[in-house]
């Protein structure tokens, strides 16, 4: 199974970050650094777990490089970038 590591042409994605402590300011700083348009969508918290979801628009960027940037934030344990068509159900 092969995955393309470069995303192209203004597609919408969901950026899902999971971990013990997610600093929203640090996340938005990275998005601004890469000049990625974003909308905050959801934050779920439990005692020792947080999940934050952002809708992002990517042109042509190495997802590996972007993902590594989020892992520099202490407390982030998982980073997911998911294709998104604008609909959320469930």
Where in the sequence are the language-model features?
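Canonical alpha-helical transmembrane segment with a positive-inside/aromatic-interface signature
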Residues: 1-45
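Helix N-cap motif at beta-to-alpha junctions
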Residues: 20-21, 56-63
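Short amphipathic alpha-helices in soluble, non-transmembrane regions
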Residues: 26-34, 62-75
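Conserved short beta-strand edge segments in small beta-sheet-based binding/regulatory domains
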Residues: 38-44, 72-88
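Short, hydrophobic beta-strand segments
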Residues: 50-55
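A general structural signal for short secondary-structure boundary/capping elements
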Residues: 60-66, 85-88
